[in-house]
Structure formats: structure tokens, C-alpha cells
Amino acid sequence: MLYELLAADSGLFNLLNYITFRTGAAVVTAFLVTVLFGDMLINFLRARQGKGQPIRDLSLEMQLSKQGTPTMGGFLIWLGLIVGVALWGNLQNPYVWVTLFVTFSYAILGFLDDYAKVTKQSTDGVSAGARLIAGFGIAALACAIIMGLHGAHTPAGHAEWGPFNPLAEWIAGFAPQTSVEPADPNFSGGVAVPFVNNYFLPLGGFFILFGMIVIVGAANAVNFTDGLDGLAIVPMTFAAAAYAMIAYLTGNFVFASYLGIQFAPGAGELAVLLGALIGSGMGFLWYNAYPAKVFMGDTGSLGLGGMLGVVAVATKHEFALVVIGGLFVIEAVSVLTQIGWFKITKRLTGEGKRIFLMAPLHHHFQKKNWPETRVVVRFWILSVLFALAGLATLKLR
């Protein structure tokens, strides 16, 4: 809002033309909004939810003491994000809108799940199948839009779209304009190969399927991680900070050329959006730190993961997400391997066996009698190391 109104003015308001300034301002604004309105929203949720989020008895220390804590705290994160982006973001940027579309669509899915759990006082919400179908549908639309936006800067045009080329051309009309052409003609429908300068593996229309897997996978990985007080939000802010840097570098032709990464016109504006997320995430931690006054619920975790996934796709740094979001990947893999190994061994021997004492992985360490705070802080340490390692890969080319 302020960008559109004042950026053209000279003098002090010229600062609004700098993404770095607006990103910092979005961090501070979102943090203040989240902290100032936190108690009010938590009291509202507590009054509306009564018994709060149902807690499944996993025979873990202090677990049932969390009974009665309100959920849907993701609304607090989204409040700070909206205000931060509305004030400091460029609302004419299509990458901002497609990211917000995925974020809030996934947040709505999460809200429906949380609402079902609270109203039925059951740990079972919306079926996993329904959530996956809706999640893949949302991701498919977002990836098609991103592919169309990238196609505006691709010499080969929109050949991958076939009979839907007019739609691709219409989407491309919203893309930020630039006279710089991508170094690789497969930029639109390709996947960047790690550690190789400006080379994209051509996938054509299958790029949409690949992007869907990235977005849905990220959303569910963050959802798996959100199991202890403060566990998910801090790694999320570290990952957001790393991708804010990537978005800024990707959207700047000079820096992108120096690092040998693909220049994506307009993608730098995602740094402002991620800055608002960092601020609201820190503000949410104010209330979610042990012992938590509120849980983010699926309202928060699905939207956060969806945002991380769509930013990775938009900046063409999908594989970097495996490193930057390494903690989320480990948590998700622990769940998948636990389920898979149990089913395989049950089929082969008649008795299912487990790799971990309990999955996701943070519960495994709780079962080993680690205090909750020790698990959380050590996972935070790992997450910042993963984020730094992911940024380091930008120069390994």
C-alpha cells in the first residue's frame, strides 16, 4: 500500500524503492502487530473453544497438561503477515499474490481440520484423503500460474502449454517486465539442477506435477513438525530468512549473474512477504514458547509449509528446500519410514516392527526421556545450521 502511494516520491520516501528496507519494515510491523493483538486473540479463541484442542494420549511426560490450550493460533500469524505485506509489499506483484493464494488456501484447509477437531472434541479432523486432494488441486493451479509467469521471460515461449497456450500468454501479461532473457530456454518448464550454473532439466508440463509434490510435501512436513511448544515456528522463521535472501538474490540481475543462478524478474518482492512472515513468526513465538499459551494448529502449519513450498517453486530453488528445510524433511521421513517399515514387517512376519520409539522424530526423543525443552532447542540449533548450509550451496557451482 505505502509502496504504491509513496515510492515515486523523492526524498525520504525513496527508501520504499529498496526491497531491503521494506523487508526490514515488514519484519518489525508484523512482529508488533502479532505481539500487541496476541492476548486479545488468544482470549477470544479460549472463550470460543472451551476445552481447546483435544490431546491424544501418547504416554509422554507433561503431555496431558496441555489439555485446554486453545488452537488455531495460526490466525495470529496471518494477522501480522497481512498487515506487514499490506503496508510494505508491492501489491501489483503477481508472485506475491500467487504465494498468498496458496498460503491462505492451505490455512483454510487447516482451519477446517482444526474446527472439526474442536467441535467434535476428537483428534480426528478432516480425512487425510480429502486434504491431499484439495492440497494438490491448489498446488496445481499455483504451479500453472508460476509456469505462465516464468514463460513470459522464456525465449521458447509457452510451447509446453499446447492448446492452452492462450491461457499461458494471458498469465504472462501479468509478469514483471524485463529486457533480460533467461540464460536457459527451459526456464519456464524446467527444474534447476543443483550446483550447475543456469541449467534447467526440461520437464515441460510435468513441471506442474513436480511443483505440486514440492508444495504439498512442504505443507505436510511442517505439519508433522508442529508437535511441541515452539518447535515448528522457529525453524520456519530460519527457513523463511534463507528464502528471503534467495528471493532477493534471484530477483536482482547483478547478484544472480554473479552467483550463477537464474534471474527471475519480480521474485525479489517475495523477500518482503517472507519478512512479514519472520516478524509474525517471532511474535507468535512470544505466546507459543514453552509453556505455550496457544497452538498454531493446522491453521498455521499447513499455510506455513505451503508458503515455503510455493516460494521454492517461484524462485526455482526447489532442491534447496531439502537442505534449508532439512528439519522438516527429517520429521516427515521419520513418519513415512515408520509407517512403511511397520506395514512391510507386518506383511512379512505377521508382526509390525518400528524403527523409532515413536514418530515423528521429536516424540522418539521424548520417549528416550529427553525434556521437551531440550528436544525443541536442539532441533532449533539443527534448523539454523540447515538454513545456513542451504544458503552456502548458492556459491557451490
UniProtKB/Swiss-Prot annotation:
Belongs to the glycosyltransferase 4 family. MraY subfamily. It is a multi-pass membrane protein. This is Phospho-N-acetylmuramoyl-pentapeptide-transferase. It comes from the Bacteria. It catalyses: UDP-N-acetyl-alpha-D-muramoyl-L-alanyl-gamma-D-glutamyl-meso-2,6-diaminopimeloyl-D-alanyl-D-alanine + di-trans,octa-cis-undecaprenyl phosphate = di-trans,octa-cis-undecaprenyl diphospho-N-acetyl-alpha-D-muramoyl-L-alanyl-D-glutamyl-meso-2,6-diaminopimeloyl-D-alanyl-D-alanine + UMP. The keyword Cell division applies. InterPro entries: Glycosyl_transferase_4, PNAcMuramoyl-5peptid_Trfase, PNAcMuramoyl-5peptid_Trfase_CS.
